[in-house]
Amino acid sequence: MPRRLTTKLRSSFASRVAHPKALLLAVCSFFIASNCFSSLSTSALPETKKTSIGRPSTIRVPATGFQSHLRSIPGLRVSPSLFPSTAVDESRPALEEDTEGRGDWFTFQRTYPSNSIPPDARLRAWNSRQRNQVANLAPQAAQTWRSVGPTATVSAWYPFWGLTSGRVNAIAVSPANSSLVLVGASTGGIWRSTNGGESFVPVSDDQVDLAVGSIAFSKSNPSIAYAGMGDTKFGYMGSGILKSTNEGKTWLRVSNSSLPSPGTIAKLEIDSSNPDRVYVAQYSTVAGNKVTSSGLYVSTDGGIKWKRTLAGAPRDVVIDPSDSKVLYAGLSRIEKDTDPDFGLYRSSDSGDTWTNLFSAQYDLARRRDFRVAISPANPRMIYTYFGGFVGSNLDARLRFSTDAGTTWTDRFLWTIDTAQLGYNTYLAADPQDPLTVYIGSRDLFKSTDGGGSWTNLTGNFYDSGAGFQYAPGGSATHTDQHALAFSPANPNEFYLGNDGGVSKTTDNGASFSSLNRTLTLSQFIGIALHPTNPAISYGGTQDNGTQIRSADSTWQEVLTGDGGHVVINPLDPSVVFMTYVRGDIFRVVNNGQSFELQVGSNATFGEFFQTPRIAFYPPFVGNGVDSTLYFGSWRLFISTNLGNSWFAPAGSLDLTKGVREVGSDVLSAIAVARSNRSVIYTGSVQGRAMRSTNGGQSWVDITAGLPDRSITSIAIDPTNPSIAYVSVSGFNTGHVYKTTNTGASWIDVSGSLPDIPASALLIDPSDPNTVYLGTDIGVFRSTTQGNDWRSFNRGMPPVVVHGFSANGSGVIQAATYGRGVYELGGPSDRPSIVSVDFNGKKRLTISGTGFGDSPKVIINGQDRSNRLSESSDTSAVLSGKTKKLGLKSGDNSVQIITSDDLSSNVFTITVIL
């Protein structure tokens, strides 16, 4: 049977096996954070970190375990107290990250119960939002969110990875200007660099969609670029095709309904001689039972109208560099009864018709990935890379042809790490050598003999003889590779996109530099703001761990892997509880700098099997008053002694809808009343709401009146536990419901809200009449207890908002899934750039507010403060020759940083010299 979402979800909340990147969390992350980086900010770090792993074959973890491995690194001192007793057994092979479980967690909420997303749902919601801008409200409503980073993150493996950011799916280098680089983030939009990646600025924040699947420049007219939207890596559905006619400076959505929604663009290609002829491989798994939006589509009018010429689920499409009429497409297979065979297809008539060159002869019912690359140096040399999809028995292989597809030879890939194929997957042919080919997996592998032998260029995993073992000490980049783009001017220079952002090599992969200093792409799951110090925050992110903010935009990764929810002990804020996925909870002391104890696991919560009923990112909260902790599986667990022990006050009572055909239901939201901690509300991913008035000992079902949708958040009035709000995900329903009688009845207070999934609620602690709602297109706010809503997104792009946190100083933070953390309130003297003027010769004037008398001026990521000729609180003037000012033709980024490390917005000035 085909593996649809409904069948996957039987295991979506089941723990596959804990990823070693997370199990190493305390082993390495806390050590590095507390011993190496406790006093560092990103401004004190090198602009880029160049890392070479030397001979990959020498990377080994001693049999005595990872502590010995850390001790073997020069300059590192290991304190035994920093290592938990549950540290990973390094003698075992590394197991796969649960990328599919993460994807199911994200997708199930949005598709339950129909297993589909309505066509153009996001676009309609966006248009509705535009009609309800907060500018229509009173003047005091015109507050502005500001980004507080991470820009970028001091990674747990900083000596090797450098600074990190969030997941990058696509990279394109201009064929006319090798310094012009575009990157597409998973859910963070398009970013542009004019200096080879030294600095980036976002350029698509005014568009409906920030999920990017593919980007390409036109070779015949490099002013034109296209972006295919959507994240095929279990992220977010796309809204079609964006187009730029000015080298990526600005973008417009051009595709009409002939490119059906929803879908994700896995690959986009442009005809080498005709910039109006565009091909896209659109891939979708949640467009209904028959996945009708998937297929290979062709446009001949610059991306407006589209025609599907090949049905199925394509993962890749490439154009023959010697003949633009010849195309190759790699097809996956989802629907066994209706999809074409999984395999390689060729078109000789510009994509009008297709012929199958070969099909895999095994396990066609499984979903698979399929990638294609053609050697620019010898277009008769074609490589394909295919196999299973994020699971066991991948059967990955490289199949190549030296005669343009007439005959084929298999290369088995037993010596390289192909784990997570379908998540971190690409194939690239060297522009000069037809025998050199690259495979992106968890690491980047290179072959110079047509796939006969391989070298690991990034070095996070090594072959232990019994599988690939995770040992990033000595590695060169973040794990999980998603994109590779060559520089047209230098064949030894190429860019990598991975789960940690962008890296670059200028020596053909011998070493890599991190290019993440100006990128803010982290995908946060939640946020916890220090109760008294608004400069300190904690948040869990997708594959960039749990991070601590200790300065304006400086964050440090202290818990590796996937970070979940965080709880700060209100009685002693130096004690923090951090989560990985499923049931793993860790107690950290010394303001997040020292690991103390693992206080939760699947077994802790009675889940002893490989398929525990615990959400991928389970609900985990405090009550804001004392140190009591609350954790949800399908039951509610409580700890009153800092996590040292847990109990289920209602015993084995199931607070969810139980085990059903669509999968095992689990808790997704918990809220405890501050004014009466005996009142507790819970919500489940399949829409069951429960309430207890005696501390969780007994429960009442309060689902009646709520829609059959995933409950994502619950907020209780701080002074009246009878008043509560519930947010729900999905479509074709209201998204905020309110009770005034402890759940006995519910009122739909969605009002003018667009029909878009909602994930987070916050009642303003200083004004219970004001409620904030985090949705998939940003923040909405009601100042009338939910009676009406207005878009409250000034300063924030249309990004998914997963969580809020607030403290008594009036600061509110929003955790976004793709653009880091945004803050409302905060220091009133924060600098802001209003305008920048360059006279074209020797003088640059920056105007704004809050500069102080000696601001630091950052131009294109470089400190140019020594060029200051005069400054005040409202202006800064730099004088000198153009070269000394650091300005060059094209876009330049300008930023002000005050003496107390407060930073302004990044201002872009275009210089024509």
Give the location of each predicted region:
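Beta-propeller blade termini and top-face loops
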Residues: 54, 58-827
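Bacterial N-terminal signal peptides
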Residues: 22-35
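Surface-exposed, short loops/turns at beta-strand junctions within beta-sandwich domains
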Residues: 882-890
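N-terminal secretory signal peptides that target proteins for export/translocation
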Residues: 1-18
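Signal peptide processing junction and immediate N-terminal pro/mature segment
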Residues: 36-50
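Solvent-exposed serine/threonine-rich low-complexity stretches and specific carbohydrate-binding patches
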Residues: 862-873
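Beta-strand/beta-sandwich contexts
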Residues: 827-856, 864, 891-893, 901-913
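Aromatic sugar-binding surface patches on proteins
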Residues: 871-881
